[in-house]
Swiss-Prot record:
Part of the 30S ribosomal subunit. Contacts proteins S8 and S17. May interact with IF1 in the 30S initiation complex. One of its GO terms (cellular component) is small ribosomal subunit. One of its GO terms (biological process) is translation. One of its GO terms (molecular function) is rRNA binding. Keywords: Methylation, Ribonucleoprotein, Ribosomal protein, RNA-binding, rRNA-binding, tRNA-binding. It comes from Klebsiella pneumoniae subsp. pneumoniae (strain ATCC 700721 / MGH 78578). It holds the Pfam family Ribosom_S12_S23. The modification 3-methylthioaspartic acid is found at D89. This is Small ribosomal subunit protein uS12. InterPro entries: NA-bd_OB-fold (IPR012340), Ribosomal_uS12 (IPR006032), Ribosomal_uS12_bac (IPR005679). With S4 and S5 plays an important role in translational accuracy. Interacts with and stabilizes bases of the 16S rRNA that are involved in tRNA selection in the A site and with the mRNA backbone. Located at the interface of the 30S and 50S subunits, it traverses the body of the 30S subunit contacting proteins on the other side and probably holding the rRNA structure together. The combined cluster of proteins S8, S12 and S17 appears to hold together the shoulder and platform of the 30S subunit. Gene3D superfamilies: Nucleic acid-binding proteins.
């Protein structure tokens, strides 16, 4: 236990919180251009072909972003919006592509959880 005098001379150091999404620079979303669109495999015990893309952001960062939902229209040079949120079984993927924003279309024929996939309300 430090004495009062020791604390007066050298106060306790504050713990600095490290961001899980440094490329966003404290913004909710960032715009970027796809440099590569590809599939990758998750780590054990899962098995799939996960759709991801490499994105060069407006602030110069180059990050990997996950493309959620069934089917997408992204290719190289597509302009997309990314948000934070990692994919637990894909190492190094710490961002998600926002569906239905900029060049990324919403998920076709989506009926439930539509707001997460950029889909308008269907006509009754």
């Amino acid at each position: 236990m430090a004495t009062i005098n020791q604390l007066v001379r050298k106060p306790r150091a504050r713990k600095v919180a490290k961001s899980n999404v440094p490329a966003l620079e404290a913004c909710p979303q960032k715009r970027g251009v796809c440099t590569r669109v590809y599939t990758t495999t998750p780590k054990k015990p899962n098995s799939a072909l996960r759709k991801v893309c490499r994105v060069r952001l407006t602030n110069g960062f180059e990050v990997t972003s996950y493309i959620g939902g069934e089917g997408h229209n992204l290719q190289e040079h597509s302009v997309i919006l990314i948000r934070g949120g990692r994919v637990k079984d894909l190492p190094g993927v710490r961002y998600h592509t926002v569906r239905g924003a900029l060049d990324c279309s919403g998920v076709k024929d989506r009926k439930q959880a539509r707001s997460k996939y950029g889909v308008k309300r269907p006509k009754a």
